[in-house]
């Protein structure tokens, strides 16, 4: 008869930018956890929240919640143990809102602007 009765469905990912925004939202609301060991077991039985915002007690993180086990190093400050030299004294781009810009690179500490004039002989011929 020339007609087709078969349908094919497949799953697709959302746009990459949407995934990035969702991960960033989860990153900013991530919770510090620590493993809780049962007395009879050697491995952790669950993770408990160390800090519950706005309330007391502990709770088990949900399967979709982003958690972390230790604080990230502060890359603004020098920390030899973490291998970070910090950002103090580094040149930055005052007009850039991106990673090399002064506002981000200087971690909100402010920055000094230096204007330098350099003269040299160009060996020009007229």
Swiss-Prot record:
Give the UniProt subcellular location, in the record's own words: Secreted, Extracellular space, Extracellular matrix
Biological processes annotated in GO: canonical Wnt signaling pathway; cell fate commitment; neuron differentiation; positive regulation of JNK cascade
The name under which this protein is listed is Protein Wnt-7(II)
Q: Which GO terms describe its cellular component?
A: extracellular space
Instruction: Explain the purpose of this protein.
Output: Ligand for members of the frizzled family of seven transmembrane receptors. Probable developmental protein. May be a signaling molecule which affects the development of discrete regions of tissues. Is likely to signal over only few cell diameters.
According to the record, glycans are attached at 93
What does UniProt say on post-translational modification here? Answer: Palmitoleoylation is required for efficient binding to frizzled receptors. Depalmitoleoylation leads to Wnt signaling pathway inhibition.
Tell me which family the UniProt entry assigns to this protein.
Answer: Belongs to the Wnt family.
Q: Which Gene3D superfamilies match?
A: 3.30.2460.20
Name of encoding gene: WNT-7(II)
Lipid modification (O-palmitoleoyl serine) maps to 1
Signal peptide location:
none
Disulfide linkages recorded for this protein, renumbered to the chain, are 92-107
- What UniProt keywords are attached to this protein's entry? Developmental protein, Disulfide bond, Extracellular matrix, Glycoprotein, Lipoprotein, Secreted, Wnt signaling pathway
């Amino acid at each position: 008869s020339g007609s087709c009765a078969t349908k094919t469905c497949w799953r697709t990912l959302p746009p990459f930018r949407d995934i990035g925004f969702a991960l960033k939202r989860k990153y900013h609301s991530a919770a510090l956890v620590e493993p809780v060991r049962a007395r009879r077991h050697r491995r952790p039985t669950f993770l408990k929240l160390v800090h519950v915002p706005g309330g007391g007690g502990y709770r088990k993180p949900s399967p979709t919640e982003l958690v972390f086990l230790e604080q990230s190093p502060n890359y603004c400050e020098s920390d030899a143990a973490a291998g970070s030299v910090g950002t103090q004294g580094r040149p930055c781009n005052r007009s850039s809102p991106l990673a090399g810009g002064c506002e981000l690179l200087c971690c909100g500490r402010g920055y000094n602007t230096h204007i330098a004039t350099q003269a040299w002989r160009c060996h020009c011929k007229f």
